[in-house]
Protein backbone atom coordinates (compact mmCIF):
# COMPACT_ATOMS: atom_id res chain seq x y z
CA UNK A 1 0.00 0.00 0.00
CA UNK A 2 2.24 2.75 -1.25
CA UNK A 3 -0.22 5.49 -2.03
CA UNK A 4 -3.66 6.66 -0.96
CA UNK A 5 -6.14 8.15 -3.36
CA UNK A 6 -9.08 10.08 -1.97
CA UNK A 7 -12.04 10.21 -4.30
CA UNK A 8 -14.80 12.62 -3.42
CA UNK A 9 -18.36 12.91 -4.59
CA UNK A 10 -21.73 11.36 -4.09
CA UNK A 11 -25.40 11.63 -4.85
CA UNK A 12 -28.23 9.74 -3.23
CA UNK A 13 -29.54 7.15 -5.68
CA UNK A 14 -33.14 7.80 -4.75
CA UNK A 15 -33.19 11.57 -4.34
CA UNK A 16 -30.28 12.87 -6.37
CA UNK A 17 -29.14 15.00 -3.41
CA UNK A 18 -25.38 15.23 -2.99
CA UNK A 19 -24.18 13.68 0.27
CA UNK A 20 -20.49 14.61 -0.13
CA UNK A 21 -19.26 11.28 1.18
CA UNK A 22 -15.54 10.63 1.04
CA UNK A 23 -14.10 7.27 0.06
CA UNK A 24 -10.46 6.37 0.56
CA UNK A 25 -8.95 3.86 -1.86
CA UNK A 26 -5.47 2.40 -1.54
CA UNK A 27 -3.36 1.98 -4.66
CA UNK A 28 -2.20 -1.62 -4.30
CA UNK A 29 -0.04 -2.07 -7.36
CA UNK A 30 0.94 -0.44 -10.64
CA UNK A 31 1.33 -3.02 -13.40
CA UNK A 32 3.87 -2.13 -16.11
CA UNK A 33 1.92 -3.77 -18.90
CA UNK A 34 4.49 -3.61 -21.63
CA UNK A 35 1.89 -2.29 -24.05
CA UNK A 36 3.42 0.12 -26.54
CA UNK A 37 0.36 2.36 -26.77
CA UNK A 38 -2.71 3.40 -24.77
CA UNK A 39 -4.50 0.71 -22.74
CA UNK A 40 -8.14 1.24 -23.69
CA UNK A 41 -9.97 -1.48 -21.77
CA UNK A 42 -9.48 -3.89 -18.85
CA UNK A 43 -11.61 -6.85 -17.76
CA UNK A 44 -11.59 -9.21 -14.78
CA UNK A 45 -12.25 -12.92 -15.17
CA UNK A 46 -15.27 -14.00 -13.06
CA UNK A 47 -13.03 -15.54 -10.38
CA UNK A 48 -10.81 -12.46 -10.22
CA UNK A 49 -7.65 -14.45 -10.94
CA UNK A 50 -7.04 -13.23 -14.50
CA UNK A 51 -6.93 -9.69 -15.84
CA UNK A 52 -7.13 -8.89 -19.55
CA UNK A 53 -6.00 -5.61 -21.12
CA UNK A 54 -6.84 -4.28 -24.59
CA UNK A 55 -4.45 -1.80 -26.13
CA UNK A 56 -4.14 0.52 -29.10
CA UNK A 57 -0.98 -1.47 -29.97
CA UNK A 58 -3.44 -4.10 -31.35
CA UNK A 59 -2.74 -6.71 -28.66
CA UNK A 60 -4.55 -8.18 -25.66
CA UNK A 61 -2.47 -8.80 -22.53
CA UNK A 62 -3.26 -11.55 -20.02
CA UNK A 63 -2.26 -11.28 -16.39
CA UNK A 64 -2.59 -13.82 -13.58
CA UNK A 65 -2.54 -13.23 -9.87
CA UNK A 66 0.37 -14.90 -8.08
CA UNK A 67 -1.09 -16.55 -4.93
CA UNK A 68 0.14 -15.00 -1.70
CA UNK A 69 1.34 -18.35 -0.32
CA UNK A 70 3.56 -18.91 -3.36
CA UNK A 71 5.00 -15.43 -3.08
CA UNK A 72 5.65 -16.06 0.62
CA UNK A 73 7.36 -19.40 -0.06
CA UNK A 74 9.63 -17.77 -2.60
CA UNK A 75 10.28 -14.87 -0.26
CA UNK A 76 9.38 -12.60 -3.12
CA UNK A 77 8.62 -8.94 -2.84
CA UNK A 78 7.89 -8.91 -6.55
CA UNK A 79 4.67 -7.99 -8.31
CA UNK A 80 1.40 -9.65 -7.42
CA UNK A 81 0.42 -9.84 -11.09
CA UNK A 82 2.42 -11.58 -13.79
CA UNK A 83 1.91 -11.49 -17.56
CA UNK A 84 1.38 -15.00 -18.88
CA UNK A 85 0.29 -14.28 -22.43
CA UNK A 86 -0.20 -11.79 -25.23
CA UNK A 87 -2.94 -12.35 -27.79
CA UNK A 88 -2.12 -11.09 -31.26
CA UNK A 89 -4.27 -10.94 -34.36
CA UNK A 90 -5.97 -7.58 -34.61
CA UNK A 91 -4.70 -5.39 -37.43
CA UNK A 92 -5.39 -2.16 -35.58
CA UNK A 93 -6.29 -0.66 -32.20
CA UNK A 94 -8.05 -2.96 -29.71
CA UNK A 95 -11.01 -1.10 -28.23
CA UNK A 96 -12.63 -3.51 -25.77
CA UNK A 97 -12.15 -6.86 -24.06
CA UNK A 98 -14.61 -8.98 -22.02
CA UNK A 99 -14.81 -12.39 -20.31
CA UNK A 100 -17.82 -14.68 -20.61
CA UNK A 101 -19.90 -15.40 -17.50
CA UNK A 102 -17.96 -18.60 -16.71
CA UNK A 103 -14.54 -17.32 -17.76
CA UNK A 104 -14.10 -19.94 -20.47
CA UNK A 105 -14.23 -17.42 -23.29
CA UNK A 106 -12.71 -14.02 -23.94
CA UNK A 107 -13.80 -11.55 -26.62
CA UNK A 108 -11.90 -8.62 -28.09
CA UNK A 109 -12.76 -6.05 -30.74
CA UNK A 110 -11.00 -3.31 -32.60
CA UNK A 111 -10.72 -0.60 -35.17
CA UNK A 112 -10.11 -3.26 -37.83
CA UNK A 113 -13.89 -3.96 -37.74
CA UNK A 114 -13.36 -7.40 -36.24
CA UNK A 115 -14.49 -9.31 -33.15
CA UNK A 116 -12.28 -12.15 -31.94
CA UNK A 117 -13.39 -15.00 -29.68
CA UNK A 118 -10.70 -16.73 -27.61
CA UNK A 119 -11.07 -19.93 -25.57
CA UNK A 120 -9.14 -20.73 -22.39
CA UNK A 121 -7.01 -23.87 -22.71
CA UNK A 122 -5.92 -26.36 -19.98
CA UNK A 123 -2.33 -25.07 -20.20
CA UNK A 124 -3.51 -21.53 -19.31
CA UNK A 125 -3.13 -20.45 -22.93
CA UNK A 126 -5.92 -18.91 -25.02
CA UNK A 127 -6.78 -20.13 -28.51
CA UNK A 128 -8.67 -18.12 -31.13
CA UNK A 129 -11.84 -19.99 -32.07
CA UNK A 130 -13.55 -17.31 -34.12
CA UNK A 131 -12.84 -14.14 -36.08
CA UNK A 132 -16.04 -12.28 -36.87
CA UNK A 133 -15.96 -9.44 -39.38
CA UNK A 134 -19.60 -8.41 -39.55
CA UNK A 135 -19.41 -4.68 -38.91
CA UNK A 136 -18.63 -2.18 -41.66
CA UNK A 137 -16.82 0.22 -39.29
CA UNK A 138 -14.66 -0.04 -36.17
CA UNK A 139 -16.11 -1.94 -33.22
CA UNK A 140 -16.38 0.04 -29.99
CA UNK A 141 -17.55 -2.50 -27.43
CA UNK A 142 -18.02 -6.22 -26.75
CA UNK A 143 -20.00 -7.77 -23.88
CA UNK A 144 -21.18 -11.25 -22.92
CA UNK A 145 -24.62 -12.35 -21.78
CA UNK A 146 -24.63 -12.82 -17.97
CA UNK A 147 -25.88 -16.42 -18.09
CA UNK A 148 -25.22 -17.78 -21.59
CA UNK A 149 -22.50 -17.81 -24.21
CA UNK A 150 -24.08 -15.04 -26.27
CA UNK A 151 -21.81 -12.24 -27.43
CA UNK A 152 -22.84 -8.71 -28.43
CA UNK A 153 -20.83 -5.97 -30.15
CA UNK A 154 -21.46 -2.28 -30.83
CA UNK A 155 -20.00 -0.29 -33.68
CA UNK A 156 -19.38 3.01 -35.41
CA UNK A 157 -21.69 1.66 -38.14
CA UNK A 158 -24.70 2.38 -35.84
CA UNK A 159 -25.54 -1.31 -35.32
CA UNK A 160 -25.38 -4.02 -32.68
CA UNK A 161 -24.42 -7.57 -33.66
CA UNK A 162 -25.27 -10.70 -31.68
CA UNK A 163 -23.25 -13.92 -31.96
CA UNK A 164 -23.60 -17.55 -30.89
CA UNK A 165 -21.65 -20.73 -31.47
CA UNK A 166 -23.13 -23.19 -33.95
CA UNK A 167 -21.96 -26.65 -32.78
CA UNK A 168 -22.00 -27.90 -36.36
CA UNK A 169 -20.00 -24.98 -37.69
CA UNK A 170 -18.46 -21.98 -35.91
CA UNK A 171 -19.27 -18.72 -34.21
CA UNK A 172 -21.54 -16.58 -36.34
CA UNK A 173 -23.64 -13.41 -36.24
CA UNK A 174 -27.25 -14.47 -35.81
CA UNK A 175 -28.92 -11.07 -35.73
CA UNK A 176 -28.30 -7.36 -36.23
CA UNK A 177 -30.07 -4.80 -34.04
CA UNK A 178 -30.80 -1.43 -35.63
CA UNK A 179 -32.49 1.51 -33.94
CA UNK A 180 -29.74 4.07 -33.40
CA UNK A 181 -28.97 6.76 -35.98
CA UNK A 182 -25.30 7.13 -35.04
CA UNK A 183 -22.38 5.33 -33.37
CA UNK A 184 -23.31 2.81 -30.66
CA UNK A 185 -20.79 3.32 -27.87
CA UNK A 186 -21.81 1.02 -25.07
CA UNK A 187 -23.89 -2.07 -24.23
CA UNK A 188 -25.11 -3.66 -21.00
CA UNK A 189 -27.31 -6.69 -20.31
CA UNK A 190 -29.83 -6.70 -17.48
CA UNK A 191 -28.94 -9.14 -14.65
CA UNK A 192 -31.64 -11.56 -15.79
CA UNK A 193 -30.33 -11.49 -19.36
CA UNK A 194 -33.74 -10.74 -20.85
CA UNK A 195 -32.98 -7.11 -21.67
CA UNK A 196 -30.14 -5.21 -23.33
CA UNK A 197 -29.34 -1.50 -23.04
CA UNK A 198 -27.44 0.38 -25.76
CA UNK A 199 -26.19 3.97 -25.71
CA UNK A 200 -25.28 6.05 -28.70
CA UNK A 201 -23.87 9.18 -30.27
CA UNK A 202 -27.50 10.03 -31.10
CA UNK A 203 -28.10 10.90 -27.40
CA UNK A 204 -30.49 7.99 -26.81
CA UNK A 205 -30.52 4.75 -24.85
CA UNK A 206 -32.50 1.88 -26.32
CA UNK A 207 -33.86 -0.98 -24.21
CA UNK A 208 -34.11 -4.24 -26.15
CA UNK A 209 -36.22 -7.18 -24.96
CA UNK A 210 -35.45 -10.81 -25.65
CA UNK A 211 -38.48 -12.50 -27.22
CA UNK A 212 -38.49 -16.29 -26.98
CA UNK A 213 -39.04 -18.55 -29.97
CA UNK A 214 -42.49 -19.49 -28.66
CA UNK A 215 -43.49 -15.85 -28.30
CA UNK A 216 -42.13 -15.12 -31.78
CA UNK A 217 -44.62 -17.66 -33.13
CA UNK A 218 -47.45 -15.92 -31.24
CA UNK A 219 -46.36 -12.52 -32.56
CA UNK A 220 -45.88 -13.77 -36.10
CA UNK A 221 -42.20 -12.81 -36.27
CA UNK A 222 -39.18 -14.93 -37.08
CA UNK A 223 -36.80 -16.12 -34.35
CA UNK A 224 -33.06 -15.82 -34.94
CA UNK A 225 -30.16 -17.96 -33.79
CA UNK A 226 -31.72 -21.38 -34.31
CA UNK A 227 -28.96 -23.98 -33.92
CA UNK A 228 -28.95 -27.64 -32.77
CA UNK A 229 -30.14 -27.62 -29.17
CA UNK A 230 -31.07 -23.94 -29.34
CA UNK A 231 -34.53 -22.65 -30.28
CA UNK A 232 -33.45 -19.08 -30.95
CA UNK A 233 -35.00 -15.72 -30.05
CA UNK A 234 -35.55 -12.18 -31.27
CA UNK A 235 -34.26 -8.96 -29.69
CA UNK A 236 -36.95 -6.30 -30.02
CA UNK A 237 -36.51 -2.54 -29.38
CA UNK A 238 -38.92 -1.92 -26.50
CA UNK A 239 -38.23 1.53 -25.08
CA UNK A 240 -36.16 4.58 -26.03
CA UNK A 241 -34.76 6.79 -23.25
CA UNK A 242 -34.27 10.21 -24.78
CA UNK A 243 -34.23 13.90 -23.90
CA UNK A 244 -31.97 13.52 -20.87
CA UNK A 245 -28.56 14.07 -22.49
CA UNK A 246 -27.38 16.87 -24.76
CA UNK A 247 -24.45 14.98 -26.25
CA UNK A 248 -23.21 11.48 -27.08
CA UNK A 249 -23.81 8.87 -24.36
CA UNK A 250 -20.51 7.06 -24.01
CA UNK A 251 -21.37 4.56 -21.29
CA UNK A 252 -24.33 2.65 -19.94
CA UNK A 253 -24.29 0.01 -17.20
CA UNK A 254 -26.98 -2.10 -15.54
CA UNK A 255 -26.66 -2.65 -11.78
CA UNK A 256 -25.97 -6.32 -10.98
CA UNK A 257 -28.16 -8.28 -8.61
CA UNK A 258 -31.87 -9.01 -8.52
CA UNK A 259 -34.31 -6.53 -7.01
CA UNK A 260 -37.35 -7.55 -4.99
CA UNK A 261 -38.83 -4.06 -5.05
CA UNK A 262 -41.58 -3.94 -7.71
CA UNK A 263 -40.62 -0.34 -8.44
CA UNK A 264 -37.22 -1.63 -9.53
CA UNK A 265 -38.39 -4.72 -11.37
CA UNK A 266 -35.83 -4.03 -14.06
CA UNK A 267 -33.32 -2.56 -11.63
CA UNK A 268 -31.12 0.48 -12.00
CA UNK A 269 -29.31 1.75 -15.09
CA UNK A 270 -26.55 4.37 -14.99
CA UNK A 271 -25.42 6.36 -18.02
CA UNK A 272 -22.95 9.14 -18.75
CA UNK A 273 -21.57 11.05 -21.68
CA UNK A 274 -20.11 14.07 -23.39
CA UNK A 275 -22.30 16.64 -21.62
CA UNK A 276 -20.74 15.72 -18.27
CA UNK A 277 -23.90 14.25 -16.74
CA UNK A 278 -24.28 11.02 -14.81
CA UNK A 279 -27.89 9.85 -14.58
CA UNK A 280 -29.32 6.87 -12.72
CA UNK A 281 -32.56 5.53 -14.17
CA UNK A 282 -35.02 3.23 -12.40
CA UNK A 283 -36.75 0.95 -14.89
CA UNK A 284 -40.22 -0.35 -14.08
CA UNK A 285 -42.33 -2.75 -16.10
CA UNK A 286 -46.08 -2.39 -16.04
CA UNK A 287 -48.77 -4.68 -17.39
CA UNK A 288 -52.21 -4.04 -18.74
CA UNK A 289 -54.83 -5.64 -16.47
CA UNK A 290 -58.31 -6.86 -17.31
CA UNK A 291 -59.71 -3.71 -15.69
CA UNK A 292 -57.79 -1.49 -18.07
CA UNK A 293 -55.31 -0.37 -15.44
CA UNK A 294 -51.61 -1.12 -15.10
CA UNK A 295 -49.73 -3.12 -12.48
CA UNK A 296 -46.01 -3.38 -11.77
CA UNK A 297 -44.05 -6.47 -12.73
CA UNK A 298 -43.19 -8.48 -9.64
CA UNK A 299 -39.94 -10.20 -10.63
CA UNK A 300 -37.10 -10.20 -13.11
CA UNK A 301 -38.50 -13.36 -14.69
CA UNK A 302 -41.63 -11.56 -15.90
CA UNK A 303 -40.16 -10.66 -19.26
CA UNK A 304 -43.23 -9.69 -21.25
CA UNK A 305 -44.10 -6.13 -20.24
CA UNK A 306 -46.84 -4.11 -21.85
CA UNK A 307 -44.90 -0.94 -21.09
CA UNK A 308 -41.69 0.19 -19.48
CA UNK A 309 -41.72 3.22 -17.22
CA UNK A 310 -38.44 5.07 -16.66
CA UNK A 311 -37.86 7.25 -13.60
CA UNK A 312 -34.77 9.41 -13.05
CA UNK A 313 -33.58 8.37 -9.61
CA UNK A 314 -30.51 10.58 -9.46
CA UNK A 315 -28.65 13.04 -11.66
CA UNK A 316 -25.30 14.79 -11.34
CA UNK A 317 -24.49 17.73 -13.61
CA UNK A 318 -20.83 18.37 -14.47
CA UNK A 319 -19.81 15.20 -12.68
CA UNK A 320 -16.18 15.73 -13.69
CA UNK A 321 -16.28 19.48 -14.07
CA UNK A 322 -16.73 20.68 -17.63
CA UNK A 323 -15.29 17.59 -19.36
CA UNK A 324 -16.68 14.37 -20.83
CA UNK A 325 -17.53 11.39 -18.64
CA UNK A 326 -16.20 8.40 -20.56
CA UNK A 327 -17.26 5.46 -18.42
CA UNK A 328 -19.56 4.59 -15.50
CA UNK A 329 -19.75 1.24 -13.71
CA UNK A 330 -21.71 -0.12 -10.78
CA UNK A 331 -19.79 -1.85 -8.02
CA UNK A 332 -20.16 -5.66 -7.84
CA UNK A 333 -23.18 -7.17 -6.15
CA UNK A 334 -23.17 -6.87 -2.36
CA UNK A 335 -22.24 -9.89 -0.25
CA UNK A 336 -25.85 -10.27 0.91
CA UNK A 337 -26.99 -10.59 -2.72
CA UNK A 338 -28.50 -7.13 -2.93
CA UNK A 339 -27.86 -4.68 -5.75
CA UNK A 340 -24.97 -2.24 -5.29
CA UNK A 341 -25.34 1.45 -4.49
CA UNK A 342 -21.84 2.57 -5.43
CA UNK A 343 -20.81 3.87 -8.87
CA UNK A 344 -17.36 4.63 -10.29
CA UNK A 345 -16.91 7.14 -13.11
CA UNK A 346 -13.94 8.10 -15.29
CA UNK A 347 -13.59 11.42 -17.09
CA UNK A 348 -11.39 13.43 -19.41
CA UNK A 349 -10.03 15.20 -16.33
CA UNK A 350 -7.98 12.08 -15.56
CA UNK A 351 -9.92 11.35 -12.38
CA UNK A 352 -11.92 8.41 -11.12
CA UNK A 353 -14.81 9.46 -8.90
CA UNK A 354 -16.91 7.30 -6.59
CA UNK A 355 -20.60 8.01 -6.09
CA UNK A 356 -23.11 6.59 -3.67
From Swiss-Prot:
Protein name per UniProt: Probable cytosolic iron-sulfur protein assembly protein 1
General function of this protein: Essential component of the cytosolic iron-sulfur (Fe/S) protein assembly machinery. Required for the maturation of extramitochondrial Fe/S proteins.
Any one cellular-component term (Gene Ontology): cytosolic [4Fe-4S] assembly targeting complex
Keywords noted in UniProt: Repeat, WD repeat
Species, as recorded: Malassezia globosa (strain ATCC MYA-4612 / CBS 7966)
Family, similarity comment: Belongs to the WD repeat CIA1 family.
Residue spans crossing the bilayer: none
Cross-referenced Pfam families: WD40 (PF00400)
Spans of repeat WD: 34-73, 89-128, 134-173, 179-218, 244-291, 319-356
Record carries keyword Protein biosynthesis: no
UniProt key word Ribosomal protein: no
Coiled coil, from the record: none
Residues annotated as signal peptide: none
SMART domains given in the database record: WD40
BP term (GO), one: iron-sulfur cluster assembly
Stored InterPro entries: CIAO1/Cia1, WD40/YVTN_repeat-like_dom_sf, WD40_repeat_dom_sf, WD40_rpt
Amino acid sequence: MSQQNTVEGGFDLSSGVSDKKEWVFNLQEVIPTGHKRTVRSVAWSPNGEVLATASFDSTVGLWERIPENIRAEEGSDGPEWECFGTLEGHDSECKSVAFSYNGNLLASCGRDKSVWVWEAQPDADYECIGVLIEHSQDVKCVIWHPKEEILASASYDNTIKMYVDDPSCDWYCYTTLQAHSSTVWSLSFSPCGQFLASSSDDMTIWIWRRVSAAECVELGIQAHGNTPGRSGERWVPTYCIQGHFSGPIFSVNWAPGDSFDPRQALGKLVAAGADGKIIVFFLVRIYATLRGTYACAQSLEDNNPSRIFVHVGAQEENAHGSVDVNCVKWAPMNTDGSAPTMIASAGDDGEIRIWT
